[in-house]
Amino acid sequence: MNLFHDIRLLVVHALDQMVAADQLPQGLSYANVTVEPPRDPLHGDMATNAAMVLAKPSGQSPRAIAEALAPLLRADPRIAGADVAGPGFLNLSLCTSVWQGLVGQVLENGAAYGRSDLGNKRSVNVEFVSANPTGPLHVGHTRGAVFGDALANLLDY
């Protein structure tokens, strides 16, 4: 389970409801709609840029889109709050039960939690140490080696 992916699907579904209710025009692309952690944790658990991204193509103000989107998101049992901030960002707070369920999944899956098949069976070349054989080594080479090795291990996981 990827919580951010699941909530993004919820946002896209709510946007589809707005299109069906003629609150948004048909044919809008949701490709640039994101759900991510807010810059300030006091603003909630997640934030979406949906209203900001869709404002120009829909010909509406981002704040108006966010204010119409918020109640649709609040109707989902996973969402404790959906608050419009600034020009049209939407900050989302998740119910405690969502976090409890996530902890249960972590405990159930153990070391396999977070494993993904994204990019499975694809070859990736990670080049991370490029020390000049005729020059002196320095701390930057060590940093590159450690970072590259960690990245390669994550990709292998």
What are these model-derived regions, one by one?
Residues 1-119:
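N-terminal alpha-helical targeting/anchoring segments
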Residues 52, 56-57, 100-157:
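N-terminal catalytic cores of NTP/NDP-binding nucleotidyl/phosphoryl-transfer enzymes
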